[in-house]
Regions:
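An N-terminal boundary/leader segment
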Residues: 1-53, 292-294, 350-351, 460-476
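Serine-dependent amide/ester hydrolase catalytic core
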Residues: 11-17, 57, 326-412, 459-475
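N-terminal, positively charged, Ser/Thr/Ala/Gly-biased leader segments
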Residues: 20-28, 34-97
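Acyltransferase
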Residues: 23-28, 57, 250, 277-302, ...
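Conserved hydrophobic/aromatic pocket- or pore-lining residues that grip, position, or stack substrates
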Residues: 30, 52, 74, 80, ...
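Structural helix-boundary/capping segments
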Residues: 36, 114, 164-270, 284-293, ...
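Short helix-loop capping/hinge segments that flank enzyme active sites or metal/cofactor-binding pockets
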Residues: 72-92, 256-268, 317-372, 419-429
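Short glycine/serine-rich loop/turn segments
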Residues: 72-213, 267-269, 383-398
Length: 476
């Protein structure tokens, strides 16, 4: 692959500053990469080359004058198609959506744009982000960059694939149950789900109390830089939680301070979840790496999560009710256009009675309280990000598509969590999930960076991709 397209955002900015790279040169290389590869992997549902090149020219002039508009000036950015970007439609992966272009950015996108990031394309998603694979009737299936017969996970699969293949160093995505972390794990990149409400969501999370916006990047430093930009004006008072200085932090500050003295628990094989042996081994190796860096590392069974893994209904009940609510407001003709998986999810939500939903909410509060106690004993927790290697879309059981046990509990509790590549299982990438207490985003990123540094450079997917003829295209 072209070396330029595999540079991280921080490296690009350093090159712009030193005049060894030009925003126009970089954007042109990224767009050429999209042209070369996206017909195979289907990571993008919209690209605006003309606006992107015009914005890159503007950024280049600012760098020549020595007046960059912000810390991401000239950096290409892709955005998941659940997030509003001015000049692009927000289709949500759905035939039921409007093709009309947005007049303004979502709040987090507006902050990234003011910092100089250039949104050049929208990435694919499952319909309304309903499942952890990325396929929908509108855009078809997105393919794993390591093996195009397989899924990259979801619902932010387009974002993860784009970053993995050099189609932009950063992507803005959403996570309602693992939708950032799972595709990051299966694509071999870094994904970070911030503390709930840390990043202003706007309309992207107006209908669910589980989802948050976050970065997908090729390295932890870039994820921290992107998070710093998205939170640099503080959180909106109506949607945020005051009282923690961590909410106002520069997430790049102290990123290289290491993990010496931290209390880190790990659970490589959670009770109630069958983990592939190679994935379990990778997580244990990650724990040993942090121990070698001076952390106090212990194996833990995480008792509160044993009940959650064994039950599994808490997330699926809430998730189905949220989608039932969305479908209820659609015209009858639009409901017939929905992805069958989404329709089945909404139909299941219609069958949930008030008592069952109340029980799910009470269980959520109980788990949140239990994990608050747990994180009084430990600073961080390590688990696998996902229990198995990437699967063919038809091969992933329907239940797992919407209720990922290892990641969804972080959405239930609002805790920050990162997925960092930690090795390979069967020749395919896997990830370790690093979880912190509420508001402890900086510490999660610091540990992720420490592990990343100890691990060394993670390889990129091969440059040769072939699209199999398996009928996983968009449905008219």
């Amino acid at each position: 692959m072209d070396d330029i397209v595999m540079l991280g955002a921080s490296q690009l900015v350093a090159g712009f500053m030193q005049r060894t790279l030009s925003p126009v040169e970089v954007m042109r290389a990224v767009l050429d990469q999209v042209t070369r590869l996206d017909s195979v992997v289907n990571a993008f549902c919209a690209v605006d080359e003309q606006r992107a090149m015009s914005a890159a020219s503007d950024a280049e002039r600012r760098w020549v004058r020595g007046e960059p508009c912000g810390p991401l000036d000239g950096v290409p950015l892709s955005v998941k198609d659940l997030v509003a970007v001015a000049g692009f439609p927000t289709r949500h992966g759905s035939w039921t959506s409007s093709p009309q272009r947005e007049g303004e950015d979502a709040p987090a996108m507006a902050r990234l744009r003011r910092a100089g990031a250039i949104p050049f394309g929208k990435t694919t998603t499952s319909e309304f982000g309903n499942k952890i694979v990325t396929d929908c009737p509108l855009t078809g299936a997105t393919r794993n960059p390591w093996d195009t017969r397989l899924s990259p996970g979801g619902s932010s699969g387009g974002s993860a694939v784009a970053v993995a293949l050099g189609m932009g160093p950063l992507s803005l995505a959403t996570d309602g149950g693992g939708s950032i972390r799972i595709p990051a794990c299966w694509s071999g990149v870094v994904g970070f789900k911030p503390t709930f409400s840390l990043v202003p969501a706007g309309k992207a999370a107006s209908w669910t109390a589980l989802s948050t916006l976050g970065p997908i990047a090729r390295n932890v430093r870039d994820a921290a830089l992107m998070l710093s930009v998205m939170t640099n004006e503080g959180i909106d008072r109506h949607s945020g939680i005051a009282g923690s200085s961590d909410y106002w932090a520069d997430y790049c500050a102290g990123l290289d301070d290491g993990v010496a003295g931290l209390r880190i628990a790990y659970c490589a094989a959670p009770a109630g979840v069958r983990i592939e042996p190679a994935i379990e081994a990778c997580v244990r190796q990650a724990a040993r790496a942090l121990e070698a860096l001076g952390a106090h590392v212990v194996e833990s069974d995480v008792t509160p999560l044993a009940d959650y893994y064994g039950d599994g209904c808490m997330h699926s009940v809430q998730w189905s009710v949220y989608f039932a609510q969305r479908a209820r407001h659609m015209e009858a003709a639009h409901r017939t256009l929905l992805d069958p998986d989404l329709k089945a999810l909404a139909d299941a939500g219609e069958q949930v009675d008030t008592a069952t939903f109340a029980d799910a909410l009470l269980a959520r509060h109980a788990l949140t309280a239990a994990m608050e106690v747990y994180f009084q004993r430990y600073d961080l927790l390590l688990t696998p990000t996902f229990h198995c290697s990437p699967q063919p879309v038809p091969g992933l059981p329907a239940g797992l598509r919407t209720a990922p046990a290892l990641t969804a509990w972080c959405n239930q509790t609002g805790l920050p969590a990162a997925s960092v590549p930690c090795g390979f299982a069967g020749g395919l990438p896997t990830g370790v999930q690093i979880i912190g207490r509420r508001g402890g985003d900086a510490l999660v990123l610091r540990a992720a960076r420490a592990y990343e540094s100890a691990r060394g450079a993670f390889p990129a997917p091969g440059a040769t991709l072939e699209r199999p003829a398996d009928g996983m295209e968009a449905q008219p």
